[in-house]
């Protein structure tokens, strides 16, 4: 991948991850998630599940890999629910 393109993609993913992390942090502060929840790590996991699930679903031409990846990621976030 061209370095300029890589940096642009990196910025895109960082912004997306930051938005997810901010939302998860608000959930933690508001008592929706336990205090030991790590919003940054959870955001990384959600984004990885989304992107990985999307890639697998596209290559398989089947939505099931996306469903499985997101179900697992969301279940992990829910495991921190109060």
In which residue ranges do the predicted regions lie?
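Hydrophobic alpha-helical segments that form the core
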Residues: 37-56, 72-76
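Short secondary-structure transition hinges
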Residues: 1-21
């Amino acid at each position: 991948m061209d370095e300029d393109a890589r940096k642009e993609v990196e910025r895109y993913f960082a912004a997306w991850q930051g938005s997810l992390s901010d939302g998860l942090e608000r959930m933690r502060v508001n008592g929706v998630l336990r205090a030991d929840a790590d919003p940054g790590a959870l955001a990384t996991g959600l984004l990885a599940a989304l992107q990985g699930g999307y890639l697998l679903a596209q290559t398989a031409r089947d939505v099931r890999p996306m469903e499985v990846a997101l179900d697992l990621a969301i279940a992990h976030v829910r495991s921190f629910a109060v």
